[in-house]
Amino acid sequence: MTEEAGRLLPRYSHAGGFRVAENKPVDQDCIFCRIVANESPSHRIWEDDNHLAFLSIYPNTPGVTVVIPKAHRPSYVFDNDDETVCALMKAARKVAGMLDQRLEGVGRTGVIFEGYGVDHLHAKLFPMHGTGDGSSFRRIESKGMDRFFERYEGYLSSHDALRADDDALSAMARRIRGE
């Protein structure tokens, strides 16, 4: 097998209403593919045969980590097959454990699958500094945040906003259920 034949890139097919990625040669314009191929620098912290984890060069907190499959896959997590998603989540879980154990004051790590910065499937891990006091679950609230987003602004936020109206929530639930 040639080196290029061993690299992968998604080609979409439709299966059960979902776009499922199939394999074809790597995207040479993809920064993550270039990192995998050691053609671009990165601060690697973990890898196995199929996945790679490296520190984000644009962290919003110390230790933000990107976990990727080494094979190029579409960036929208739900466009990928179950095997690919589950394998990535297992890799992310392994790396999150490393962050929890090795970063002072980190007891939990958050994960998102945003997929807009680079068109290559990836999980972003966010060490939650200040959660590593050794105790079991404790509630941490995001009080005083009333920012509501009508549309995506380039980042995700998990803060609570103002209490939503139950009639509006019921209408939204019916819409999502297709009623």
Residue ranges and their predicted role:
Residues 2-179:
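HIT superfamily nucleotide-processing domains
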